[in-house]
Swiss-Prot record:
A single cellular component GO annotation: cytosol
Organism: Rickettsia bellii (strain RML369-C)
Source superkingdom: Bacteria
Lineage of the species this protein comes from: Bacteria, Pseudomonadati, Pseudomonadota, Alphaproteobacteria, Rickettsiales
Pfam families: CSD
PROSITE patterns assigned to the protein according to its UniProt record, in alphabetical order: CSD_1, CSD_2
Subcellular location: Cytoplasm
Protein name: Cold shock-like protein CspA
């Protein structure tokens, strides 16, 4: 697991329960699911919001977990 990645919320759709985070280091955009938002105790994510997160690989699918507001 890669930890403490800095990024910015590209978009998050609360109706569809997912979105994407743009990595500050220029890497690929990272999928974020509502369950990670809920686990972080956040009400939601806003476009352009700065976040810190870890990358989790589940069966070859990368997603953001352990979200923190920067």
């Amino acid at each position: 697991m890669t930890t403490n990645i800095v990024g910015k919320v590209k978009w998050f759709n609360p109706t569809k329960n997912f979105g994407f985070i743009e990595q500050e280091n220029g890497g690929k955009d990272v999928f974020v699911h509502r369950s990670a938002v809920d686990a972080a105790g956040l009400a939601g994510l806003n476009e352009g919001q700065d976040v810190i997160f870890d990358l989790e690989d589940k069966n070859g699918k990368i997603s953001a977990v352990n979200l923190r507001i920067k």
